[in-house]
Each structure stands twice: as C-alpha cells, then as structure tokens.
Swiss-Prot record:
This protein's name: Demethylmenaquinone methyltransferase
Source lineage: Bacteria, Bacillati, Bacillota, Bacilli, Bacillales
SUPFAM superfamilies: S-adenosyl-L-methionine-dependent methyltransferases
Gene name tied to this protein: menG
Catalytic reaction annotation: a 2-demethylmenaquinol + S-adenosyl-L-methionine = a menaquinol + S-adenosyl-L-homocysteine + H(+)
Pfam families: Ubie_methyltran
Amino acid sequence: MAQSKEQRVHDVFQSIYKKYDVMNSVISLQQHKSWRKDTMKQMDVQAGTSALDVCCGTGDWTLALSEAVGEQGSVIGLDFSENMLAVGREKVAAAKRTNISLVHGNAMALPYDDNTFDYVTIGFGLRNVPDYMQVLQEMCRVAKPGGKIVCLETSQPTIPVFKQLYFFYFKRIMPLAGKVFAKKYEEYSWLQESTLAFPGKDKLRDMFVEAGMKDVTVKSYTGGVCAMHMGIKPI
C-alpha cells in the first residue's frame, strides 16, 4: 500500500533530523540564513508580542523570533517530528531561552484558539504538508486580527536559463548531496519532489488571499529560488 504524503513526510524528517541543519546550508548554498534574516526585517517583529512558528523543525526561525519578541514576549514552535523537536530543544537549552515552548503537533489542525498570535510563520514547511490551503487557513485562524502570517519557502524562478539550472540542481544534484552528506538519497529525492511540485509565487499569493488574508506582500530571493509571502489578517 502506498504511503500517504503525511506519513512519507513524517518518515523523511524522523530520518534526516541529525543532518537537517547541515543539509539546509548545503542545499541552499548557505543562503537560507540571509533569506530568513531579511524576512524578519520585513516582518518588523515587536517586543512583547507572541508568535507561532509552524513546522518549526529544529527551531532556527523559532529562536530568531524568540530574540525579536524579547523576554516579555512568547514563542511556540510546533512540529510533527519528535526527532526534529529534540534537536530544537537542545538548541533552545544552549541558547538559554525561557520564552520558547516546543510542541508536538499537526499544522493541519493547530491546537490553539482563534485570534491568539501576533505572528504566525512557516519556513520551508508548507511544501511538505498534505493540504497547503488548509494549513494557510489554520495559520490565519490562529492569528490575531491585524496579525501577520508569513511563509518563507522555495519557489520557482521565471528567468529561462536560471530556471533550467534550478530544475537540474533540484532533480539531480540535491539527492546526490543528500547521499554524500547525510547518507539519505531517497529522503532527499522526496524533498526535491516536494520543492518542484510547490506552487509558484503568484499562485501562492492567490492562495493567501483565498485563505482570508489581505495586503499580501511577496519578495523573491536569489533569482526566485526562494520567496517570502506575508499577509495580514483583516481586523
């Protein structure tokens, strides 16, 4: 019997957690940190606020949000892979952050009340969920009116030659890099599949609007291989 997307993704991340951070740097050619840093700048996170980081993985964005909201603020990182969360807990402990809670949960059914968070983020996780729209609607639901919902995700370049190189890299090079650096060829084959199947930036902008957000901002990075989408929950 074929695995569901949800089960396959869960198995992938339960397997690659030890090398996930290293492979992020390898696959993005060290760019993912600068993409996230600029996204945080665009978000203009205020001290004393609350944030939910959906599909938080090993917690890099969760930690960045924690620093931005400060001691008077609070951040929850949610992920469905216990192994990824275990790495995240080690990072939180090492950073001595007391305003972070890491929670095992499902992005498709967020265990929080409506209108709870000032910021709701998802970084390199939306492409892996079974239903993009359901997750976007859930993120919008738990955001406060006027709150920001932000997705940082791989995208698809539109420049012809660059687009061809991009597809070659993800189809051929990325799985091989996974085999060399993480000994996980099949798992990184899945990640390239999910990347190439993910909607382009214009389609994702439309999905943000359909999910209930307004004033959607889109910013592309590194020739369009990554994009930030930020929407506001109507007041």
